Amino acid sequence: MVTIFSYIALLLSALVITLTCYIGLLKIKLI
């Protein structure tokens, strides 16, 4: 159970990081 939870947490963190980077790139392109 702990390993599955940590795996999901890792996936979520990676998703959030990619989303923030993507939004940052979009803002830079818009400006």
Swiss-Prot record:
Family annotation (InterPro entries): Cyt_b6/f_cplx_su6
Keyword Transport: yes
Localization terms from the record: Plastid, Chloroplast thylakoid membrane
Gene Ontology biological process terms in this record: photosynthesis
Function: Component of the cytochrome b6-f complex, which mediates electron transfer between photosystem II (PSII) and photosystem I (PSI), cyclic electron flow around PSI, and state transitions. PetL is important for photoautotrophic growth as well as for electron transfer efficiency and stability of the cytochrome b6-f complex.
HAMAP family, per the entry: Cytb6_f_PetL
Transmembrane segments: 4-24
Source organism per UniProt: Chlorella vulgaris
The family this protein is said to belong to: Belongs to the PetL family.
Protein name: Cytochrome b6-f complex subunit 6
Tagged with keyword tRNA processing: no
Subunit structure: The 4 large subunits of the cytochrome b6-f complex are cytochrome b6, subunit IV (17 kDa polypeptide, PetD), cytochrome f and the Rieske protein, while the 4 small subunits are PetG, PetL, PetM and PetN. The complex functions as a dimer.
